């Protein structure tokens, strides 16, 4: 079936407006009740990161954070806390423009392995003075901000 030229132009314009929108990302600055940080090790780079992902259609931020923590780190949320930061610079990630909301979370210790081992190599609890140096893109700022007193807005 051939789409008329005028209609094709309309379809392309609508797609351009609908698909060129920032992705909504979430990450959890998650700590166990004894204060250890929960970090995941990414399989694509081997680097450490805060657990997180993208908001799915119909999800709230709370449900997305709970889902990602369960899937990636095998932990349950005990309570969500304050905002750690909002990251929206278009050049922050070369793959796409994301607006990432990072919140503090109090969680259980890992109860099960990550759901997708092709995405997550492992989960580890880190003491404050033992945090890894090798962090995934953008995570150094996010973790530093989560350790600070004031949330970041960019």
For each feature predicted by the language model, list its residue ranges:
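Acidic, metal-coordinating catalytic segment for phosphate/diphosphate chemistry
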Residues: 1-27
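A structural signal for short, well-ordered beta-strand segments
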Residues: 28, 83, 103-105
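Conserved hydrophobic "DFG−1" position in protein kinase catalytic cores
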Residues: 30-31, 39, 105, 125
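NUDIX/MutT-family hydrolases
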Residues: 102, 114-147
